């Protein structure tokens, strides 16, 4: 501390004009050393100021926020992410799940929407189907169907109907036949049958049957058990 006081005293005296007139010529080197020390102190102060300004500039350029503001920004970012996820879930996921859930309901409603079929009849689209579980030949099934509400042995109309019936029935006669293996397949109404029937090599398999594998030919006089036995189908067309 005494050394610093001495230095500043010398600096003050050195700056005083009177002192400069009085000072002996032999102290020239001492004054020069003092001036160098003063210059060094000023230089150090300038460097410290520049370093402080440089740190501030680097801090600003990096975009760093003070801790409270940075925390607030992170919280807002998380909230934005959660809101975006919720919106995406609402837009994409919920309609997809609703569509999947509505598909079985739509099929059920289509199968039961008329609601005017007699008891023990199955409703699908605009038709009613009766399932006769007795083992019968094709001719016996034809006669049994004719005795129920003026219906007849079913003739498959389209692929959708065939797939629906095949999915719930093991096997059943349908109202399609031919006179021989050399004749075309026709319905009991005398119309040409347009769907494919898997034929067999047996010459006497001239009656058509609905099977899980599709439409196949079988012996008209057969009542043998296949899976759960033959099931007779009839259809009563309803007014929509």
Swiss-Prot record:
One of its GO terms (molecular function) is carbohydrate binding. Its main location: membrane. PROSITE patterns: C_TYPE_LECTIN_2. One of its GO terms (biological process) is cellular defense response. Residues 1-70 are cytoplasmic. It is found in: Membrane. Plays a role as a receptor for the recognition of MHC class I HLA-E molecules by NK cells and some cytotoxic T-cells. PANTHER family: C-TYPE LECTIN PROTEINS, NKG2-E TYPE II INTEGRAL MEMBRANE PROTEIN. This is NKG2-E type II integral membrane protein. It comes from Homo sapiens.
């Amino acid at each position: 501390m005494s050394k610093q006081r001495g230095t500043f005293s010398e600096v003050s005296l050195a700056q005083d004009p009177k002192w400069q007139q009085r000072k002996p010529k032999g102290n020239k080197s001492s004054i020069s050393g003092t001036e160098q020390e003063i210059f060094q102190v000023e230089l150090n102060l300038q460097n410290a100021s520049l370093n402080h300004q440089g740190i501030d500039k680097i801090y600003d350029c990096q975009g760093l926020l003070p801790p409270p503001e940075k925390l607030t920004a992170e919280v807002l970012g998380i909230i934005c992410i959660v809101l975006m996820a919720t919106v995406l879930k609402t837009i994409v996921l919920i309609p997809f799940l609703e569509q999947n859930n509505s598909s079985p309901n739509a099929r059920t409603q289509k199968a039961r929407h008329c609601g005017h079929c007699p008891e023990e009849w199955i409703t699908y689209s605009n038709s009613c189907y009766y399932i006769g579980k007795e083992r019968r030949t094709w001719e016996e099934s034809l006669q049994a169907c004719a005795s129920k509400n003026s219906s007849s042995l079913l003739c498959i109309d389209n692929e959708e109907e065939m797939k629906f019936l095949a999915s719930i029935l093991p096997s059943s006669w349908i109202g399609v036949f031919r006179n021989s293996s050399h004749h075309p397949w026709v319905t009991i109404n005398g119309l040409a049958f347009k769907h494919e029937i898997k034929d067999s090599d047996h010459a006497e398999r001239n009656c058509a049957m609905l099977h899980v594998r599709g439409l196949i030919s079988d012996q008209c006089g057969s009542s043998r058990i296949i899976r759960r036995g033959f099931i007779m189908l009839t259809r009563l067309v309803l007014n929509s």
